[in-house]
Structures are given as C-alpha cells and as structure tokens.
A protein has these predicted regions:
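Contiguous surface segments at macromolecular interaction interfaces
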Residues: 1-6, 67-128
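Compositionally biased, charged N-terminal/linker segments
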Residues: 1-38, 120, 127-128
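Short glycine/proline-enriched turns and hinge-like loops at secondary-structure junctions
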Residues: 13, 38, 53, 69-72
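Hydrophobic beta-strand signal
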Residues: 44-45, 59
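Short, charged beta-turn/beta-strand-edge "cap" motif at the junction between a beta-strand
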Residues: 46-52
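Conserved "cap/hinge" positions at secondary-structure junctions
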Residues: 47, 62-65
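Short beta-strand-centered aromatic/proline hotspots
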Residues: 53-63
Length: 128
C-alpha cells in the first residue's frame, strides 16, 4: 500500500498521468518496502490526511531505482489499474478484525507498507 495526500497528488492526478515515479520517500522502512516490490505487484492507493481511504489499485511497472530527487533513496514506477468501486475508509479498516495487524493501523505514519495477500483481498472485498 502507498499513501498520498490527495491535495498534493490524488488518485485522479495519478490516473491522468498514466504512471508516476513514487519519489520522495524518506523513511528507511518505507524505502525497504519500495525495494521489495517487483514488477507486476498490485499496490493499494490510499488517500491520507483528507479522506483517509483506500481509493484504487496500482501496479508496479518499474522496480526500485535511485530516487532522482535524492539518489541515496529509492523510487518505483507505479501505474493505475482501476479505482475501487467503493472507497474503504480507515474507520472501516480499523473496525475489521481481519485487518487488526495491518501496518496502516499499527504504524500509521508509514507511507509505503506491505500487505499480506489476505489483507489485500479483505480490503478489496470491503470495496464491493
């Protein structure tokens, strides 16, 4: 899962761009999560601060490479796959016991986080 403030770069901005380099990550754990991504991985796109909801599915289109804004860090290229039929709010995620261990709840400041297949699938099922 990747998090972004929608007033800075929203799902709609992402879709309009067609793809984007996910740059500017300056946390070691989040950086390591970027480096672990492989081409084709599905990634949930979360609006943070405003909305606080999962809004779409993206895909890794280019694996980790030096972040052009600071080459000590890493970025990946993501492309949009599709919006969720219904956004899944943070309130709904917190209320779902199957998601009790999700990093979004446990480490809310982390901007790039892994999900298990079960967590990913559970969020998708909540979006229908």
């Amino acid at each position: 899962m990747v998090k972004q403030e929608p007033d800075k770069y929203s799902w709609d901005d992402f879709v309009a761009d067609g793809a984007t380099d996910w740059t500017g990550v300056r946390n070691f754990q989040a950086r390591n999560n970027l480096k672990a991504m492989v081409k084709g991985d599905k990634v949930l796109f979360y609006h943070s601060n405003v909305g606080k909801e999962v809004v779409g599915i993206a895909q890794v289109s280019k694996v980790a490479f030096p972040d052009p804004t600071d080459e000590k860090w890493f970025a990946v290229e993501l492309e949009p796959v599709k919006p969720l039929k219904k956004a899944v709010t943070l309130v709904d995620i917190k209320a779902n016991l199957a998601l009790a261990e999700i990093k979004l709840v446990r480490q809310s400041q982390l901007s790039v986080m892994p999900l298990t297949k079960d967590q990913f699938d559970e969020i998708l099922s909540m979006s229908k």
